[in-house]
Amino acid sequence: MCIRDSIYHIDETAGRIIQASFCGVSDVCGTAHLPMIPGHTVSTFAIRFHAFGAYAFADDALRGTLNGFESPEVRFGRLDRALRARLPELRGLSARTAYAQSVLLAFQCRENPLVETAADALLYHRGTATVSEWAHELFISSRQLERLLGEYWGLSPKKGSALVRYQALYQEICHGTLTDVQDAVARYGFADQAHLCREFRRYHGENVSRFFKTSCENGRTMEENGVYPPEEAST
């Protein structure tokens, strides 16, 4: 959800990149498919950005990237060129990861303290603050917040709040710290149970009541995959 991926599909047999894409923050459920070439070995290498920090590596604003799917060169031209130049010739995930990390450290150049503070406030409130309350904490207007997040995150404040609220709710259910739908309605500021159910199904594709019943299993899966609550996530 609140992530962005730069994905490279590499034809190991021919030693070339056959497809590259940048996927923006998504608020819908979907699937991805690995391109196949008969008789060739195809691998995938990807860089996953936190939605609130990807702007540091971008050459251009991220406005319009919500649910977007485009070539990495459109927003990350310098990074894309550096990765394309070396990824096919490097062998193994460790070598490619080390190279990608060195490139990212060299190219991280954009910083905006206000954007970082906005991310901290969003995560602290778990997406439950209104846009006006959020803007007030940053000492800016709601309109300024709208422009700021549109440029740096490619999201509206309302959309960013909705996604973080969903993820916080999801993780609380999985960790077993929230076990009742009505408690969830009150804690996360939903208008009523129907509102919560609509929002959860929109992002998760499953009924929230059913999800509560399988929370123990989901909690074990999260622990195995190293998924952490919002307050532990870094921007």
Language model regions located:
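Sequence context surrounding c-type heme c attachment/ligation sites in exported
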Residues: 1
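Alpha-helical bundle regulatory/interaction domains
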Residues: 4-119, 123-132, 138-142, 155-156, ...
